[in-house]
């Protein structure tokens, strides 16, 4: 019988658990340590911290007749509570807790959820989760099992999640399995997810953790986890211990692909991700590796409007014209997400692609781009200037919301002024030079004996109006 099926040594209703939960809730670490080190017996006792199991609470409002096949009860419920025999049941982890929702949310059918919430743990897991090194040492000296995981997570998992290097080291020194999988199929190394967990990761590897171990439903390796979170120092550590730079996860992603597809919110995260990708590329990562959807790292970087990362990938040979299974190019991905990206990032991304030889949008599709990116006129300007001559139609005005038009009136007036006028000679010269240089424009233009303003003009720097 598993620990999950066995009665816990200290059920939720026990006095010790009540005091322990109170101490945990208030952050009373001294009381927590006292309870788990001196009052809980045996040392590997199973403690129940949560249990919403309806079967143990007779007062719960659960229609047991539905589960037990009571026809009369079911008929009564149909008459009183819902009117649709196709009521939706959402089942998660086997729990059976009835949650009534308003008609406004789910209509007349309502929603029945069957959800199980139970948390089992041990004193050692609690001590490791809170970083109580002395408590962990005391429990281990009393022969606590370092691999016990009655709730699906062991003490080493908890230590790594909490970035507690000293606790992780103690557990490993006392025989904790560095590759022990939790209930989600993740090893401790997969749980080193923050910059502060670097020490835990190093301890795990020095104690024999498998650096190439796949884990979880996504079959990510530790290098994938580091890449997804922009942990460049973790990635360097893993590569030093033999991690394969182009290993693929269950979605066909390499670590580079995973890094480019992760959203970076702060400038620090952006910088770490850029360093990580540069590290992977120096280590031999394929800049154009495709995932199961045929998306390259460049597709993903463009989808997040990260011009610095796009430049890095293109310098390492990424294909600016690559198409995914849906027929979308990196440029298309950049345009699709332009209105959601931070200021200046979308047009910089589009500039980078066009200056590295990406084909522009098919002319007939330009009205659609205008409709999608109207709020970002800089993107429209950069893209429009990539054509030698694109006929402007007055009908395009319908694609621009009135408030957007008024907000960016100078630019859109200059756009529609070209409806019956050819582009200026300076623009035509720009297009001729760019056509001559092709995808080498970004390298050759800066070498021309021209003022910086003209070099920027040749590289499609937006000016705010068209001529």
From Swiss-Prot:
Pfam families reported in the protein's UniProt record: Ank, Ank_2, Ank_3, SOCS_box
Alphabetical list of InterPro entries matching this protein: Ankyrin_rpt, Ankyrin_rpt-contain_sf, SOCS_box, SOCS_box-like_dom_sf
PROSITE patterns with a match to the protein in the record: ANK_REP_REGION, ANK_REPEAT, SOCS
BP terms from Gene Ontology: intracellular signal transduction; protein ubiquitination
CDD domains xref list: SOCS_ASB4_ASB18
Domain SOCS box: 406-464
Comment, domains: The SOCS box domain mediates the interaction with the Elongin BC complex, an adapter module in different E3 ubiquitin-protein ligase complexes.
Purpose of the protein: May be a substrate-recognition component of a SCF-like ECS (Elongin-Cullin-SOCS-box protein) E3 ubiquitin-protein ligase complex which mediates the ubiquitination and subsequent proteasomal degradation of target proteins.
Protein name per its UniProtKB record: Ankyrin repeat and SOCS box protein 18
Source lineage: Eukaryota, Metazoa, Chordata, Craniata, Vertebrata
